[in-house]
Amino acid sequence: MEKRKIILDCEPGHDDAIAMMMAAKHPAIDLLGITIVAGNQTLDKTLINGLNVCQKLEINVPVYAGMPQPIMRKQIVADNIHGETGLDGPVFEPLTRQAESTHAVKYIIDTLMASDGDITLVPVGPLSNIAVAMRMQPAILPKIREIVLMGGAYGTGNFTPSAEFNIFADPEAARVVFTSGVPLVMMGLDLTNQTVCTPDVIARMERVGGPAGELFSDIMNFTLKTQFEYYGLAGGPVHDATCIGYLINPDGIKTQDMYVEVDVNSGPCYGRTVCDELGVLGKPANTKVGITIDTDWFWGLVEECVRGYIKTH
């Protein structure tokens, strides 16, 4: 089996933590590094959350802090969903794990430039780190094998009627990425909302147990409350984890090639991913857009990763 080399760019974040857990354990993924961006909460908080998850699950991968602000817009956070810490719910041991001193953007540039073009970027938060890296060193563009991102929607948004949070948090950065010419795969809300983590899924992971089962339970029981409160959902979708699922086995997720453009005009559609589903613009497709996911397969994959953290000795 070919291991996909990835850099996971995230803003933990409840579903980010599930993506980290899966990426670090599945044998099909070679997780080179974790870069952190501001998003669900401010950078100081998302960094601590990322380090806490790595410490609890003994994920021995370097962690790099990145952009603390969006490129242009005023910063927003998703504390309504993720709480004051950005990862409310779990209680962690005192933190001893530390981030690397190198800036995430420099790490992304240096790693890509030294590569053979075989590294996939997996940004599951606002695209600030990726866009700044692209602007600082355009020579990375042909070095990126693929970008598999969580963000956007071809239907309704979740932070405004038009926009999904990750894109709305930094639309200008998203515009840079979507016009980069790099092969893109977009897991938008239309797909990720199919992965609602209901109480029976939580119970299934609790039965598996181990440190990842415990963390999964603490994380997803918190989002049960907030997702029902704000969106009327029967549980929290594990949005970001769908990107890892796609990388492990793209056959589990149906995609459609579309031309996607990010609206950066101020107004009610600011931050919208405009997806030309019918091809009416006649522009060449630049994105594989996730349409449907085999949820039985997906939860089986999550369980497999949770089970991987149980120590046998």
UniProtKB/Swiss-Prot annotation:
It holds the Pfam family IU_nuc_hydro. Substrate binds at residues 227, 239. It is an enzyme of class 3 (hydrolase). The active site is at residue 11. GO terms for biological process: purine nucleoside catabolic process; pyrimidine nucleobase metabolic process; pyrimidine ribonucleoside catabolic process. Keywords: Calcium, Glycosidase, Hydrolase, Metal-binding. Its cofactor is Ca(2+). GO terms for cellular component: cytosol. The keyword Calcium applies. The keyword Transcription does not apply. Ca(2+) binds at residues 11, 16, 124, 240. Binds 1 Ca(2+) ion per monomer. Its EC number is 3.2.2.8. It catalyses: a pyrimidine ribonucleoside + H2O = a pyrimidine nucleobase + D-ribose. GO terms for molecular function: calcium ion binding; purine nucleosidase activity; ribosylpyrimidine nucleosidase activity. NCBIfam families: PRK09955.1. Hydrolyzes cytidine or uridine to ribose and cytosine or uracil, respectively. Has a clear preference for cytidine over uridine. Strictly specific for ribonucleosides. Belongs to the IUNH family. RihB subfamily. This is Pyrimidine-specific ribonucleoside hydrolase RihB. It comes from Shigella flexneri.
